[in-house]
């Protein structure tokens, strides 16, 4: 048996010693297509607090995901926002900014397999970081397959305003998309610049208007906003409120409090402005 602590692309704390193994090269789309199917109700085990590891059951799936199936199709993100964990992956390999994904047939087959094991599944959720960043031609292939073969609603929960286009939204809705979630984060150009987020306020507003055009065909879109940034001024907060006030209704807001992890670039940027970073235990 091989020592698990030698596994590439992982770090381990073993016997009070940090082991930093080499990183494997990023997989190509062809290699992603050649991966075996994801384990899903294939004799996995799950940890129950106070009980230890046990065989996973349908009840475990139901308590975690209800009647939905959660998946990720694309890997990578073209942005480099300092508040996001992707910034650390990009630090290790700049190619992580390139969007990589398996073929439309592969992701549809994955969903087929999940439904074959749990026929009661009634929705699919894509948790990609930049789903709309895929080329139109790939989305079109996916939509044709999904509409013809899967035939249950799906939601897209990782959308960057820069990549919101009417033609992409239209074909996704026709295939069964019923909800979308987009990251806005702030209505202040100053704070967006601080986060190293290149999406301009004008483009954010354009994206909300595009989504509003399709409000008859889907649930209200959800928009992410980050608060409790120690760098944010009263003027920055007011700019965010003004933007929210101007956005077309209806919509939902997901409000997040910024948690700064020590030794990250975000922490260094905040400390560079003379602001103390609380311990991660606080």
Where are these regions (language model features)?
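Radical SAM [4Fe-4S] cluster-binding motif and immediate context
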Residues: 41-218, 227, 242
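Structural beta-sheet core signal
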Residues: 156, 223-225, 255
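C-terminal accessory region of radical SAM enzymes
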Residues: 28-36, 41-45, 213-220, 247, ...
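Structural recognition of alpha->loop->beta junctions
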Residues: 1, 171-179, 241-255
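Short, intrinsically disordered, charge-balanced linker/junction segments flanking boundaries
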Residues: 1-7, 173, 246, 277-282
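Short aromatic-enriched loop/helix-cap "lid" or pocket-rim segments at secondary-structure transitions
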Residues: 23-25, 32, 82-83, 138-139, ...
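Flexible glycine/acidic-rich beta-alpha junction loops that bind and position SAM and/or redox cofactors
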Residues: 79, 190-195, 227-235, 250-282
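Glycine-rich beta-alpha loop elements in corrinoid/cobalamin-binding modules
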Residues: 1-29, 263
């Amino acid at each position: 048996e091989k020592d698990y602590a030698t596994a590439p692309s992982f770090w381990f704390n073993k016997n009070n010693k940090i082991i930093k193994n080499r990183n494997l090269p990023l997989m190509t789309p062809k290699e992603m297509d050649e991966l075996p199917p994801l384990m899903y109700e294939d004799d996995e085990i799950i940890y129950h607090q106070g009980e230890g590891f046990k065989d996973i059951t349908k009840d475990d799936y139901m308590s975690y995901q209800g009647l939905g199936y959660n998946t990720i199709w694309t890997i990578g993100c073209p942005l480099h926002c300092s508040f996001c964990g992707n910034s650390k992956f990009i630090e290790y390999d700049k190619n992580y900014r390139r969007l990589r994904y398996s073929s439309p047939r592969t992701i549809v087959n994955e969903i087929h397999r999940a439904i074959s094991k749990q026929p009661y599944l009634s929705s699919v959720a894509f948790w990609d970081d930049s789903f709309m960043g895929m080329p139109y031609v790939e989305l079109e292939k996916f939509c044709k397959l999904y509409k013809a073969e899967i035939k249950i609603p799906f939601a897209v929960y990782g959308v960057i305003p820069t990549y919101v286009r009417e033609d992409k939204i239209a074909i996704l809705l026709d295939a069964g998309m019923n909800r979308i979630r987009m990251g806005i984060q702030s209505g202040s150009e100053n704070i967006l610049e601080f986060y190293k987020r290149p999406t301009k306020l004008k483009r954010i507003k354009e994206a909300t208007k595009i989504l509003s055009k399709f409000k008859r065909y889907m649930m209200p879109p959800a928009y992410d906003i980050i608060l409790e940034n120690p760098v944010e001024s009263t003027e920055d907060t007011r700019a965010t409120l003004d933007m929210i006030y101007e956005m077309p209704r209806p919509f939902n807001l997901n409000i997040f409090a910024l948690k700064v992890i020590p030794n990250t670039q975000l922490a260094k940027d905040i400390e560079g402005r003379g602001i103390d970073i609380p311990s991660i235990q606080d």
